[in-house]
Amino acid sequence: MNIGLVLRTVAHLRSAQVLFQVLRRVHKARFKALACPSVEVKPMVVEPAAKWQSYDGKRFAFLNIEDEFRGWNNTAHGMLWAYNQNYMDWLCQPGMTAAEGARWIDRFIADMPTNRVGLDPYPIALRAINWVKFFSRFPKESTAERRDSLYSQLRLLERKLEYHLLGNHLLEDAYALYIGSAYLKDSRMHGRASRLLRRQLREQVLSDGAHYEQSPMYHCILLDRLLDCINAGEGEFADLVLKPVAVRMLGHLESIVYADGTIPLLNDSAEGIAPEPAAIFAYARRLGLQWTPVALGECGYRKFDNTDVEAVVDVGNIKASYQPGHTHADSLSFELRLGGKPFVVDSGISTYDKTPRRQLERSTAAHNTVVLAGKSSSE
């Protein structure tokens, strides 16, 4: 272990992160089956952006690895693969039927007593949003038993908010509580979610509309879910808080995206994970939003383009210094396209597992820049 590296990293953590790292080990919140207090729901009315095809009726495909269902706790392909299975994104993929989706929801509910992975806060958050979208699309599948399970999972999420990580994880928690409580018409939960969401958007979305973890892929993911919040919510909070932030984020995406509609693979970014920019723009238009490109500034990226040349350069520092989990040591790295085709590319990422491969992909040596004195630029 490199003690100096550990100390230089820990020095940037916030006191709340340290405190909640301890608390979550001492006090482990348990799942409790509860009855949803409301019998009415408020479904989304605008069609969301479609999810990538990850389930073919027999096998799941996540992170370029295919396998059949072997239980919710199947970590043979790594924890992130198991997380993806528990997100249940495939409920929102094209071609998903009401009967097939309901069957998987019922199977999940039946298996909850032995499901360890699926009751981690991040999978709860993403799954809750997917369930709301599915129930909005197929209202007859929103039975009392399934709503009770959704409500119980959201109540567990309230007790397991990811203050030990902060960053996009806590923002996703806020999104889920906001969308879930809007659907279930739970005013208490909705008020708490609105306050948390307001604080996190204020902190995490930079002045030029970029998400502060500086990953174009995560920017698309978080913008898509912000649009989901606008779809689920209503009133002054949506109009005065959510929509202005969404417009700014849309303007940033418009500025950073390449002419062919793809994103630069900077920091933790890969293809086939987030909704495509075109799908996000179409979703925003269905919600009645209008935006214009926002000049790249605080995000640290600069884009140069003319008829034949497009270049994106990273000239900034790490913004979320207390949560650099999706950041790479890529200072002054760049991508270059000539005649609309990739010429100098970033390698992107292939894994989140704690392996030498993960460390290499985040290092300066893996990017289009120089290594000085054998050290990554983060050092």
Q: Across the structure, where does each feature detected by a protein language model lie?
A:
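Active-site rim segments in enzyme catalytic domains, especially the processed small/beta chain
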Residues: L332-E379
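Extreme N-terminal leader/anchor segments
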Residues: M1-R70
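Carbohydrate-active enzyme catalytic cores, enriched for enzymes
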Residues: A210-I349
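Residues that flank catalytic or metal-binding motifs in active/ligand-binding sites
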Residues: N86, D173, G300, D330-L332, ...
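Short alpha-helix boundary/capping segments
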Residues: L119, I124, P324, H328, ...
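Short polybasic amphipathic segments
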Residues: K58-F62, G71, R302, F334, ...
